[in-house]
Amino acid sequence: MLLGGPPRSPRSGTSPKGPWSSTGHVQFGKSPQTWPRRTRPRSPEPAAPSGVRGSTWTRRRDSPRRAGPTALSRYVGHLWMGRRPPSPEARGPVPRSSAASRARRSLASPGISPGPLTATIGGAVAGGGPRQGRAEAHKEVFPGQRVGKMAAPMELFCWSGGWGLPSVDLDSLAVLTYARFTGAPLKVHKISNPWQSPSGTLPALRTSHGEVISVPHKIITHLRKEKYNADYDLSARQGADTLAFMSLLEEKLLPVLVHTFWIDTKNYVEVTRKWYAEAMPFPLNFFLPGRMQRQYMERLQLLTGEHRPEDEEELEKELYREARECLTLLSQRLGSQKFFFGDAPASLDAFVFSYLALLLQAKLPSGKLQVHLRGLHNLCAYCTHILSLYFPWDGAEVPPQRQTPAGPETEEEPYRRRNQILSVLAGLAAMVGYALLSGIVSIQRATPARAPGTRTLGMAEEDEEE
């Protein structure tokens, strides 16, 4: 077909630039790899006509005959312009991406607007298709992202429960309540041996990165950094009220709470020391409750300051009077609300609950402040509501039945008794060994005593022999 001649179809037309002076060859058919081998030499490359800018390919590209994407897309990879196609031997091996590169060049031509089929080809070449793009998106890994690994959960070590509470320790109960309010994903270990904690004290938090935090307010600060913040919706005024009431609790209510459980002789012997002695393993139950009492006495001295022994009775009356005023103020601030700042709990509710629940649930023989607290009905209902809502089984008097309670308990009972007996024997052996090594106890071999007439009889026998 000679270019520049009259159009052969209604769709074709004369180029707006006029008929082309050079002749070219357009051949539609099979791929050049299937053509027979040529025997005659190649025809020379036709020179571009004078007065026309660009090569034959550029002029052919700008022709309006190439404006139809549907007609062109069928022949992508089978169209050669300007000269006869060479033989496969002369061209050499064709790379696999030749058809894709030709399609990409045809799509980049300014005279072609991509149609449905052209857009599909371009998407397959450039992006690998929608399925491949989604597959590659799933394989993408961002900086700092762990592939195939999940972060270790946070672990909270706290004192075990008693008296109908999830924990009998003030700090442990406050941290545990705050975690329940925020829904923090914690793996809770309720233990009665502080030496099993990673820090040696309770409560303690082991973060997902392995860091150990043992101070209660630092534990709560870490939970807030992990986006578990119970005070997120509080206003500036409510935040200021939280700080004010927290200071009031530490200054007015905490000294009386320490005095009630650890200093008052009757309460300490019949309630506090009894619970810790029964919960702790041997031999910690012999000396650890007394050590904890001394620590709380030092803490109370820091809170109240130094005072003379004769002023202890007057100081105790003053502390209990201020504590009753603090409870009355809390009752007035709570009113008929579910929580101190509305229908959602905050950090203040966690600390107030930990203070009030210990006073309310423990069966104290000497409960001066407990009587006043039970007279404030809204505070009692407040504690009961939190226990039933956030600790339905931990705070209940009757714990839920286990599915297989007989198996592990019956197996552990003889081993527990055996361990206790072995511990006692090991302690006795250590004491006896220490006494022998230090010289407190010495073992001497006893010489046999001779009878009184033995020496006289021996002397008589010697005289007879002489």
From Swiss-Prot:
There is a cross-link at residues 187, 190, 227, 317 (Glycyl lysine isopeptide (Lys-Gly) (interchain with G-Cter in ubiquitin)). GO terms for biological process: inner mitochondrial membrane organization; lactation; mitochondrion organization; protein insertion into mitochondrial outer membrane. The chain crosses the membrane at residues 421-441. It is found in: Membrane; Mitochondrion outer membrane. SUPFAM superfamilies: GST C-terminal domain-like (SSF47616). Residues 1-19, 90-110 have a biased composition (Low complexity). Its main location: membrane. Ubiquitinated by PRKN during mitophagy, leading to its degradation and enhancement of mitophagy. Deubiquitinated by USP30. Residues 1-133 are annotated as: Disordered. GO terms for cellular component: cytoplasm; membrane; MIB complex; mitochondrial outer membrane; mitochondrion; SAM complex. It is a single-pass type I membrane protein. InterPro entries: Glutathione-S-Trfase_C_sf (IPR036282), Glutathione_S-Trfase (IPR040079), Metaxin_GST (IPR033468), Mito_Protein_Transport_Metaxin (IPR050931), Sam37/metaxin_N (IPR019564). Keywords: Isopeptide bond, Membrane, Mitochondrion, Mitochondrion outer membrane, Protein transport, Transmembrane, Transmembrane helix, Transport, Ubl conjugation. Involved in transport of proteins into the mitochondrion. Essential for embryonic development. PANTHER family: METAXIN RELATED (PTHR12289), METAXIN-1 (PTHR12289:SF34). Belongs to the metaxin family. Interacts with MTX2/metaxin-2. Associates with the mitochondrial contact site and cristae organizing system (MICOS) complex, composed of at least MICOS10/MIC10, CHCHD3/MIC19, CHCHD6/MIC25, APOOL/MIC27, IMMT/MIC60, APOO/MIC23/MIC26 and QIL1/MIC13. This complex was also known under the names MINOS or MitOS complex. The MICOS complex associates with mitochondrial outer membrane proteins SAMM50, MTX1 and MTX2 (together described as components of the mitochondrial outer membrane sorting assembly machinery (SAM) complex) and DNAJC11, mitochondrial inner membrane protein TMEM11 and with HSPA9. This is Metaxin-1. It comes from Homo sapiens. The lineage of its organism: Eukaryota, Metazoa, Chordata, Craniata, Vertebrata.
